[in-house]
Swiss-Prot record:
Superkingdom field: Bacteria
Residues binding Zn(2+), per UniProt: H138, H142, E207
Origin species: Paenarthrobacter aurescens (strain TC1)
Cofactor requirements of the protein: Zn(2+)
Main location: membrane
Localization per Swiss-Prot or TrEMBL: Cell membrane
Organismal lineage: Bacteria, Bacillati, Actinomycetota, Actinomycetes, Micrococcales
Location of the active site: E139
Membrane topology label: Multi-pass membrane protein
HAMAP family per record: Pept_M48_protease_HtpX (MF_00188)
Enzyme class: hydrolase
Keywords: Cell membrane, Hydrolase, Membrane, Metal-binding, Metalloprotease, Protease, Transmembrane, Transmembrane helix, Zinc
Entry protein name: Protease HtpX homolog
Length: 289
């Protein structure tokens, strides 16, 4: 029931995201007295969704300067991923390594047959084999649950909404053909905000599910809890720079790779680490020491 409810929640939020995009089109249409902008917004949404679907793996891997590794180069990674893939009765994904020393990992790809798992050099140095197994279990469940498709498409549509909102704010309010400039300004400001909230809610739901499903796959919730605690500490000491390419791919990572608190943390696509660890402790029936 829990997973079913989360699936319905994700579908509903994605529907709202599309409604926001079409709402932007409606505001533009009201100003221009034409339905063409609505169709343009719909086409942009479809094109962006298709692009996110087909290129999610390439975008994320490129942003982290990751490269494929062979079993001879990363025997431990291959051993763990192969074991968990067999346990789940799923195809084994391609394995990549990113040279960054910030500890993190992510999975990407539109489906299990076209998936890739990437670890950073930093996470391999930081975690022991048991903790790394917990992280890889989490990432594989993102693949098997097709969360990468969901998160990539949501991020792409949210990005379109933000861009269109900025264009409306710059050009739309001063257009003399616009019958309601105040509504245009309000929509231009609120639509990107709403898109960010929706993206955050969907991403957090999928992260909690991947934690739970990954812990079930490995049979060791506390291994993932211990890894998350170490990763949080490692990121705080060596965060990624807020480069836009990295920001665009950050929703795929197991932990928020940037330093920040306050408002930035409130609107993070990742749930609070303390809550994630607490849930895993409840699964294990005992606290992480």
């Amino acid at each position: 029931m829990h997973k079913h409810n989360n699936g319905l929640k994700t579908a509903a939020l994605f529907g709202v995201l599309w409604a926001v995009l079409l709402g932007l089109g409606a505001i533009i249409a009201a100003g221009t007295r034409s339905t063409t902008p609505i169709w343009i917004m719909a086409l942009i949404g479809v094109a962006t969704t298709a692009y996110g679907y087909w290129n999610s793996d390439k975008i994320a891997i490129r942003s982290m300067a990751a490269y494929p590794v062979t079993e001879a180069q990363a025997p431990q990674l291959y051993q763990i991923v192969r074991e968990l893939s067999v346990r789940a009765n799923k195809p084994m994904p391609r394995i990549y390594l990113s040279p960054t020393m910030t500890p993190n990992a992510f999975a990407t790809g539109r489906n299990p047959k076209n998936a890739a798992v990437c670890c950073t050099e930093g996470i391999l140095h930081l975690l022991d084999a048991r903790e790394l197994r917990g992280v890889l279990g989490h990432e594989l469940m993102h693949v098997y649950n097709r969360d990468i498709l969901t998160s990539s498409v949501v991020a792409a549509v949210a990005g379109v909404i933000t861009s269109v909102g900025q264009m409306l704010l710059i050009f739309g309010s001063g257009d003399r053909r616009n019958a309601n400039p105040l509504a245009t300004i309000a929509m231009a400001l609120l639509a990107p905000f709403a898109a960010s909230l929706i993206q955050m809610a969907i991403s957090r739901t999928r992260e909690f599910d991947a934690d739970e499903d990954g812990a079930e796959l490995t049979g060791d919730p506390l291994a993932l809890a211990s890894a998350l605690r170490k990763i949080e500490s490692g990121v705080s000491q060596l965060p990624l720079p807020p480069d836009q390419r990295l920001v665009n791919a950050s929703h795929l990572m197991i932990a928020n790779p940037f330093r920040g608190g306050g408002i930035r943390r409130m609107f993070s696509t990742h749930p609070p680490m303390k809550e994630r660890i607490s849930r895993l402790e409840r699964m294990a029936g005992r606290p992480l020491l």
